[in-house]
Amino acid sequence: MLRLALASREEAGLAALADTIRAGGVAVLPTDTLYGFSARYDHPAAIARIAALKGRADSAPFLLLIGDRRALALLTAEPPPAAALDGIWPGPVTLLLRARPDLPPLLRGAAGTVAVRWPRDRRLTALIAAIGVPIMSTSVNRQGERPLDDPDLIAGAFGAAIDVLADGGVLAGGQASTIIDLTADPPALVRAGAARVDLERLARLVRPRGSES
């Protein structure tokens, strides 16, 4: 396992992370909420490795992280209006959107949805840009256990099974993202988390065409 400290902003470290993930490796990355197992979204073998690491017995889909709005076209055929995303992204808000049918099964929910977030952390968005495609992310823990927020504990528990660990220090007080279902009418709060969202405003902005009175 390669371990990279993120205290410095060396471009070499970012390049090494990007190269590993781009080649199909499994990484652990600090996000603006929690540490996450990550891999490129279009590499089913790497995603399956992560599912095995977590010991997942369910089929709940993994989260996808993007670095800009343009990446939505790779994940959903029905991207929300740009105005609806203002004030929400970038930030700790996960949106459930209608998934493209060609996404791997581990990224699609049973109802045909995909969970997407544009994180606020600039190093993370720079990494996603360097990789060139969205990445999947899921908390660093085995199913039913508490997510790990200390890189030393992560290295001890999973170091032999991952390719690279980006060490951003202990993420004290990390809180999971807020989840909003934009496929519901009106948009619905699925999980309260690190951000508050004005659902009434959001409903006005994403209201389907022809629904105006």
Question: Model features per residue range: what roles?
Answer:
Residues 1-213:
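Active-site-adjacent structural elements in enzyme catalytic cores
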